[in-house]
């Protein structure tokens, strides 16, 4: 057989092999990226930077909050002191505004006679709305963000940035925790906190100090009855949900610490997860948005796997 006559058949056979089902592995789905992740794609909780809040109702379960010392070092240090000294124990959730925030602290904070002492915590702190962008280990999203020129993740936290100003800041995504303030920008000290329980109110960015995010248990806050007074505050004391206690992981016995870990946001696995969310490949999807934003690219949290 001549070479010229054998080429078409050989070429067809080669093409059939190349384009055969399974010749190339399909890009993974979100679930597959998480399932295939390795131990180094996850990180443990930092004991001094994690709070566990328990509501008075034991059915609510623990609310685990990871603090963000890189972005709000003064507030985080103060919150550590408040939690260590038991400031939040016995206080209450004082406000639940639908599609907005759940807020907790001292119901008598405005009363000079009844307000709970802050102990050794600072009463006055500087506003911590943003930090220098330079040298920040930001994993950027290529997707357009309507609120900032740049967005991405640092230490598992959603971040926006403006390279022209050289500043970066945490964003008000679902589950983010902030320090309530009055009119003065430096009137927050971490004794009054809130968590976002609705659509991301990004207009609050750069107006309030964000201190971390809820890793586990946000449903306990999001499912509380809504306050009926102005801005979702409770009009009667008996409407409030009590707080049993708030502790740092560092102050808890090993056996009581939540055994969870967080996916790192500086790895190839994290970037693969972002791509899988951007281009949905699950069979159910008939349309893929080919876009994500910093507030719907949620960082996974899972029960810690045994090393053995």
Regions inferred by a protein language model and the residue ranges of each:
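N-terminal signal peptide c-region/cleavage motif recognized by signal peptidases
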Residues: 20-21
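Bacterial N-terminal signal peptides that target proteins for export
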Residues: 1-11
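Cyclophilin-like peptidyl-prolyl cis-trans isomerases
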Residues: 24-308
């Amino acid at each position: 057989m001549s070479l010229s006559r054998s080429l078409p058949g050989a070429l067809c056979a080669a093409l059939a092999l190349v384009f055969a089902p399974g010749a190339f592995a399909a890009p993974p789905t979100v679930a597959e990226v998480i399932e295939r992740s390795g131990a180094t794609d996850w990180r443990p909780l930092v004991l001094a930077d994690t709070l566990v809040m328990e509501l008075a109702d034991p059915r609510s379960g623990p609310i685990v909050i990871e603090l963000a010392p890189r972005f709000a070092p003064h507030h985080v240090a103060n919150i550590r002191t408040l939690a260590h000294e038991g400031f939040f124990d016995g206080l209450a959730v004082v406000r639940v505004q639908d599609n907005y925030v759940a807020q907790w602290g001292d119901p008598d904070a405005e009363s000079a006679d009844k307000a709970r002492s802050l102990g050794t915590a600072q009463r006055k702190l500087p506003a911590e709305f943003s930090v220098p962008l330079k040298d920040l280990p930001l994993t950027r999203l290529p997707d357009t963000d309507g609120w900032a020129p740049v967005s991405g993740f640092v230490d598992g936290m959603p971040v926006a940035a403006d390279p022209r100003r050289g500043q970066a800041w945490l964003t008000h995504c679902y589950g983010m925790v902030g320090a309530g303030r009055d009119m003065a920008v430096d009137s927050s000290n971490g004794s009054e906190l809130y968590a976002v329980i609705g659509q991301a109110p990004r207009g609050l960015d750069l107006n309030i100090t964000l201190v971390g995010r809820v890793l586990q248990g946000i449903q306990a806050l999001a499912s509380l009855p809504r306050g009926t007074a102005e801005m979702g505050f409770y009009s009667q004391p008996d409407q409030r949900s009590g707080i049993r206690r708030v502790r740092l992981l560092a102050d808890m016995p090993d056996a009581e610490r939540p055994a969870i870990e967080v996916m790192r946001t500086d790895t190839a696995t994290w970037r693969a997860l972002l791509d899988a969310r951007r281009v949905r490949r699950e069979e159910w999807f008939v349309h893929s948005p080919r876009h994500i934003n910093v507030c719907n690219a949620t960082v996974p949290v899972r029960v810690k796997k045994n090393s053995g």
